[in-house]
Amino acid sequence: MAKFEIKDDVAIIPEGTTEIGEWFFARDYLSLKSVTIPESVTKIGPNAFHQCTSLESIVMPLKGIKEIGYSAFTGCSSLKNIILPKSVTKIEESTFNNCISLKNVNIPKSVTEIGWSAFSGCTSLESISIPESVTKIERST
């Protein structure tokens, strides 16, 4: 990934970056509070933000991201809301597993499948919009 800036626990990923790699923020940036992802990013790798327990805000573009890897946000216990890009077609297994503060999820019409345990352990979930385009929801979700 291209060089990015973190200031006051806020990461701004530069335009031109196409992928956030597997486990990228998971091990070294646990105090990260916010991340802004540009439209050039098409893939968020598996476990990219795994256990980033301080992460409160993810600003994603409305389009661009096509793939969000399994367990990408597992254990992000401070995350409250998520609006997925209109270009995502599948919510992978355990994507938001144990995001215990997650209250609202907006799933776009482009999504056709929700993987197992995608929202397992999201004990504060108040609202989730599942469009008619979703034809498969795996068990334990």
Please report, for each region that a protein language model flagged, where it lies by residue.
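Structural signature of tandem-repeat unit edges
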Residues: 2-19, 29-43, 53-67, 77-90, ...
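Consensus positions within tandem repeat domains that build extended binding/scaffold surfaces
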Residues: 21-24, 45-50, 69-74, 92-97, ...
